[in-house]
């Protein structure tokens, strides 16, 4: 990497950080509940990776809200290069648990939401991999939404491991232009 490329990259990173740090500061008071607490920040700090679940099903309204929250994530040039696959079929969940080395907890989960990159919607050229960032932001929104609803969830990486991508693609019959980035298994937390 030459000096001009490094400078361009650092300038972009610095600009992004500066915008993040100064943007939205004027309305901080509107983000607080009447108690004076910033519930968004508290939700971020409360979120944990949960790997023990109850078998209690999740209501369709909650699943829809989780996906809507994921879709509210920012994306480069508003491309929204994602697809979400909600899996609640026990046989498919068990296959995912059997096929993926770090997803054994899926055997307990009542559902999984698979976050995929849709390459037909992705940017072209040197920004052709921004879909990964966009899908990661969507995944974090999904995890935070699950936390706010009292659901436990964990994300399990699939991409960039080609063997995992192939296994998920096979189990879910995904077309070639859809790449599974990761999936989450939201569920009511096992508190016992």
Predicted regions and their residues:
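Conserved small/polar residues in nucleotide/adenosyl-binding loops
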Residues: 184-192
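Small-aliphatic-rich amphipathic alpha-helix that forms the alpha element of a beta-alpha
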Residues: 66, 70-71, 113, 126-170
């Amino acid at each position: 990497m030459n000096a001009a490329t490094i400078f361009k990259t650092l300038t972009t990173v610095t600009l992004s950080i500066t915008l993040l740090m100064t943007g939205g500061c004027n309305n901080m008071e509107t983000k607080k509940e009447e108690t004076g607490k910033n519930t968004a920040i508290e939700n971020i700090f409360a979120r944990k990776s949960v790997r023990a679940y109850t078998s209690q099903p999740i209501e369709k309204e909650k699943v829809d809200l989780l996906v809507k929250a994921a879709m509210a994530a920012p994306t480069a040039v508003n491309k929204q290069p994602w697809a979400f696959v909600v899996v609640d079929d026990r046989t498919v969940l068990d296959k995912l648990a059997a096929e993926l080395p770090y997803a054994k907890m899926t055997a307990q989960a009542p559902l999984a939401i698979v976050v995929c990159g849709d390459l037909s919607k992705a940017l072209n050229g040197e920004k052709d991999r921004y879909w990964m960032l966009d899908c990661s932001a969507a995944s974090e929104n999904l995890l935070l939404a699950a936390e706010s609803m009292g659901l436990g969830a964990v994300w399990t990486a699939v991409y960039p491991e080609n063997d995992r991508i192939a296994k998920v693609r096979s189990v879910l019959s995904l077309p070639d232009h859809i790449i599974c980035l990761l999936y989450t298994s939201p569920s009511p937390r096992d508190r016992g």
